[in-house]
C-alpha cells in the first residue's frame, strides 16, 4: 500500500496544467505507483489553480511516498506539519488588516523576528522570488503591506502595469502624477526604504556573500527554467527555494516590487531578462545545469563514473580465452558498447592496438639476431609499468634467440649497436601505449640462415595473426613488406656495417650528440676505391633506392605509390641488397598534402614540430642520417628510409585531415608519436613503436603496424603520410599541430641528426652529410617560406623560422639559437664568414642566409604575425649561437633589422692569381649568372635554389669525386628549385660511380677542402639567392691531400673562433667593434683555423679590406645600380668611413646615432 501526499503552493499551482503534469512526472518518475492514480492526482491540480495563502512561509511541493510499515511516523509528522501550517495561515489571514499605520508597524516588527530577507515580484513572471536563500516573509506582513498599497492606488493603476523607472517615479502610464498620487508613492517609497535600511543592517557580513550567491543562482535558474528538473539529491529547502523560477525571460527588463522590496535589492529582476550564456553554466550549480540538458558527452564527463558504468550493459563474452588482455578488453567493452561506433571509439579504444603475441616457435635460430637488438634497446630500461605507461604488457618484447650463422643479419645488427650502443634507451619511447609494443616475437624458422633472420620474424608475427586490415589498424596489407631472400655471400652486410662505423666511429656515443649536434655522427661513407669493397654495397643500395623512382616531385609528394621506391634489379650475385630492395618496394603508400622522405642509415629522426595555420612545405631526409629529432610536421608526407634504429615521439594534433605514415623495416624503435586521422604503416623488424595516442572528436584514421613491430604507441600524426624506411635507429618526437596547410620537408642524405625543428609554411631541404638539423621551430600564422640546408652541415638545431627561406650551405657543423622577436618590420640578417658564434638573436621579418662551413646554427626562433623574411648566414662560420656578434657586418643593429637588401653582400671578384679563390669564383659565377639576385626568388621560387652543377674541369682529380655526386644529384633532377623543395624525387640523389684512383676517404675529405677553401667570405652570395649557395666545388689543387682538407677546416672553424653564443646573440655591433679593434687578431684566428696564413688574409682583404673588390661585390650582389648598399655594409664591417653609409642604409632615415649606440652597447 502506497500513500501519496502532495502539498501544493500557490506558486506551484500558478503554472498551467501541462507544466504541472510535467513537473510532477519528473518528481515522481522514480516512484512505482499506478499510472492511472498518478494521472488522476495530476488532473485534479487544475482545480487548485488559484493564488492562496503562503502556508506559513513554506512555499514548495511535498511529495511523500509512504509505505505501510516503516514510514507511518513520517506520514504522521508531515500531516501534523501540514495542518499546523494551514491553521497558522488561516488565523493570521483573519487578524484584522484594516490598513492602519499601527498594523503596518506591527507587520514590520514581525519581520524583525522572522524575516531575514526580502521578496520581489517580477513583472514578467508574476511570482515572488526570495532575495536570498532561506529568508521568508510572513503572510500577515505581505498581506498587510500589499493591501495598504492596493487600497491607496488600486483605482489609479490599471492591471498593475507600471512603467515607472526605478530611480525616477515621476510617471504612471505615461502621465504626470497629481499631488495626491505623488504623496501616495512617496509614502510607499519611504516604507520600502525603511525596510531596506533595516534589513541591510540586520544581515550580518558573513551572510551577505550567501545572499549574493543565492541571487545569482536564482537568476540563473530563472534564465534556464525550461522545465522543473528532477533533483534526487536536493533537500527540501533547496527544492522549495528553486521552485517556480521557470518562465522564459521577458522582453522588458522592468520589474515591479512589493512594498517589502527595496529599490536596490532586485538583482534577480536585472539578471532575469538576460539571455542564457556560458557564464550561467559557470555560476549555476551543476545540478541545475546538467539535469534539464539532454544527455551528451559532457554529461558523461561530469557525471561520476558510477553513474556512467552502472547502467551500461556488460560487454559480450570475450572470444579469445581469458588472459591478461581480457582484463583490459572487458573494460573497453563496458565503456564503448553502449556508445555508437564512431571514429572516437577508435581513438579511445586501445583494444585494437593490443596485439596479443603469438607463441614462439621451438627452434631459436635467426630470432636471436633480433633478440640481441631488442636487448640493447630494451635492456637498459626498467621493466616497470610506468615505462610502458598504458599497456606495458604488450611492450614486453621477449627477445628471440640469435641465429647461428652471423651473416647478413650481422649487417643489420651492427648498425643497431653503433646507433643504440652509445645512446641510452629512455623510457619515453614506450611511454603511453606499451600494450601495442608487447609484440612477443614468433619462434624462428627451422633453417637459421641469413634470410631466416629477416624473414622468420616476419612470418612469426604475421603468420598467426589474421591478414585483416583491422589487425594492423586499417590498411595492413600495404605495409606487409615480405622480405626477399638475402644473397648467399654475407659481404654486403659489411657494406651496411661500414657506414654505421663511419657515422658512429668519429662521433661520441653521447645521446645528446645525436639529438642536437649529430654533425660528428655525420660520417657518411665515401665512395669506394677501385676494388669493390663494402662501399660498393652502399653505392648499389643507393642505386636501388634512387634509380627506379621517377624524378617527378609530384609523384613522391602526393602519390604514395610513386614513393614506393622500387629498387633497381640487383646485381648478378644476390647479396643482402636484395633483402633491402624488396622493402623499398613496399614502402610507398598514401600521403596527405605533404611528404617527408628520410633515406637510409638515419640513426634518429625525432622532435620535428610544425605549428598550425601555415602554408605547405616539404621535408625530405635522405640517407645516412644518424638522428632527426624534434620536428613537428602538420600536413605533409614524411618518408624515412632504411637503417633507422628508432622512430619515436611523433605527435600530431587533432582535427586534421587523414594522413599516412609508413615506417619500413629494421627500425628498432618507433615511439612517442601521436597520430590523429591518418593511416600509419610501420614495416617489419621494428622492435618498438610506442606512445601513439589519438585525440578524440577527430575524423577516422588508420594505423597499420606491419610484422615484427614490438610496439607502436604515443605518436600523433595529423593529416600527412609518413614513411620511414629501413635501418633508421631513431625517428622521434614529430608533433604536428592542427589546421595547417600542406607542406613538405626534405632532408637529404648523410644527415646524422635532424631534431627539434619547427617548420611553418615553408619547404625545407637538407642536403647530404648533415650530422644534425634540430629544433627548428616555426610559429603559426605566417607566410610561406623556404629553408634549404646544403651538404656537410654537422648540426642545425633549435632554430625558429617565420615566413622566410633559409639556406644553409655545406659543412656547417651547427646553426643554433637564433631567436626572432615579433611585431617588427621586415629585415635581413647576414652572418658573414669567420664568425665564431652567432646565437640567441631575435630577428623578425628578414632574410637570413647561412653559408658553408658553419659549425653551428641553432635555435632560430621567429615570432608570428610577421611579414616574410630571409635569413642568410655566410661561409666559414664555426658557430652561430646565442649572440649578435657580427664580425664582417656593421655594428648597427638597424641595418640588419630594417634594411635586408643592404646586407646582401655580393662577393667581389677574386684576385688576379687563380688560387683557391678561383675555385670559389667559378661556382659564384655559375650561381649568379642564371639566377637573379632577388631575395623574393628565394622566398617563393625554390627553383633558383636548384643549383645545377657546372661541368667538371679537364683533369679528373679529387674534385671529380665531389663533382660526380653533384652530377648524380642534379643530372636526373630538373634544376628548378620547386623540384628540390616540393618534389622529394629530385632529392633522391642517385650517386654517380666514384673515380677509380681516389679512395673513399678522399671522396669525403676532398669536398671539405673544396668547400672550405674556395668559398668567398662574402655573405651576400648566400643571402637571397639560394642558387648561389649551391656552390659546386671546383677541382682542388694537386698537392693538398684529402685528409688535410677535412681536418684543416675543422681546426680553423673550431680552434680560432670562440664557441660563445652570447657574442653573436644580442650585440652584433660589439662583435663588429671588436673585429675592427682586433683586426690583427682576426687574421691570426683565421691562420690558426685554416692552418694556411696566405688564403686567410686574402679572404679578409677581398671581403673587408680591399676597396677594389668591394665595388665589384656591389655590382654582383644587386645586379641593379645599388652599389652604396654593399658599400655601407662592407664599410661598416671594416672601414669607419662606410659605417655612416651603413647607418643610412639600415634606417633609410638619417638615424646614424642609432647604430653608434648599438655598437657601444
UniProtKB/Swiss-Prot annotation:
Sequence segments annotated as region (Disordered) = 278-580, 892-1161
* Key words, A-Z: Membrane, Transmembrane, Transmembrane helix
Membrane topology per the entry is: Single-pass membrane protein
Organism superkingdom: Eukaryota
Query: Bias category Basic and acidic residues: which stretches?
Result: 368-378, 410-420, 452-462, 494-504, 536-546, 918-928, 960-970, 1002-1012, 1044-1054
Record-annotated membrane-spanning stretches: 63-87
Q: Which GO terms describe its cellular component?
A: membrane
Pro residues bias located where?
311-321
Looking up PANTHER family in the UniProt record yields: NUCLEAR PORE COMPLEX INTERACTING PROTEIN, NUCLEAR PORE COMPLEX-INTERACTING PROTEIN FAMILY MEMBER A2-RELATED
Q: What is this protein called?
A: Nuclear pore complex-interacting protein family member B11
What lineage is on file?
Eukaryota, Metazoa, Chordata, Craniata, Vertebrata
The UniProt gene name for this protein comes to NPIPB11
